[in-house]
Regions:
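Juxtamembrane intracellular "pre-TM" segments in multi-pass secondary transporters
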Residues: 22-56
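Low-complexity, compositionally biased segments
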Residues: 8, 23-25, 43, 87, ...
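Helix-loop junctions on the cytosolic side of multi-pass membrane transporters
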Residues: 2-32
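Hydrophobic alpha-helical transmembrane segments
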Residues: 2-3, 52-56, 120-121, 144-145
Length: 186
């Protein structure tokens, strides 16, 4: 499994090296880029409403999800009596949903930037609704389906909020904004 993972990363790196396009905006010189500080990133976030909301969405998601993941083990051991298999199925369901969600939302709601960004709110609600139903689930398999569906929303929220930050921030400050984005979550 490690070898497959390694080879996939090497292949990805090879594909990146094949890109011949300059992907930078080239607005600022190198010396001006070096002057961008953490405070500049924070000021940019606070001054732009869209960036502010995109930046805090993962943090709010993290606060609302705090502790839920440890409940998979409790559900598996105490409620469903399925041990490691149950916990593994629940964790796998999250991953499947997080993978399917952004692709499905993009297909269903459109490919334009505005349409993708407008799905962030509904995707959070979808995540919340399906997670709310988990305590009422009679079996591990129903819980697994609820987790897949819930994480379709959670995955879309995560992917599209990151995408929004990438397309709405200038090159010279994007790293600071991304750093703030993830610091609010972790």
């Amino acid at each position: 499994l490690f070898t497959i993972n390694f080879l996939s990363f090497m292949f990805s790196a090879f594909l990146v090296f094949l890109i011949k396009t300059n992907l930078s905006e080239n607005i600022l010189s190198t010396s001006e880029n070096e002057k961008v500080k953490f405070k500049d990133g924070l000021n940019f976030v606070l001054s732009d409403k869209k960036i502010y909301y995109l930046t805090i969405t993962k943090g709010m998601f993290g606060i609302s999800a705090a502790g839920l993941l440890s409940l998979f083990t409790i559900l598996s051991l105490e409620v469903y009596d399925t041990g490691d298999l149950g916990a593994g199925l629940m964790w796998s369901a999250r991953g499947i949903g997080a993978f399917i969600g952004p692709v499905l939302f993009r297909y269903l709601f459109g490919k334009t930037d505005q349409k993708l960004l407008s799905t962030i709110g509904p995707s959070i609600m979808i995540w919340g609704i399906f997670y709310f139903l988990i305590p009422f689930s009679p079996t591990l398999y129903v819980t697994t389906i609820l987790l897949v569906l819930g994480h379709c929303g959670g995955g879309a929220q995560w992917a599209f909020s990151s995408y929004g930050i990438q397309i709405l921030t200038p090159d010279n400050i994007r790293g600071r904004i991304a750093g703030l984005d993830y610091s609010f979550y972790f």
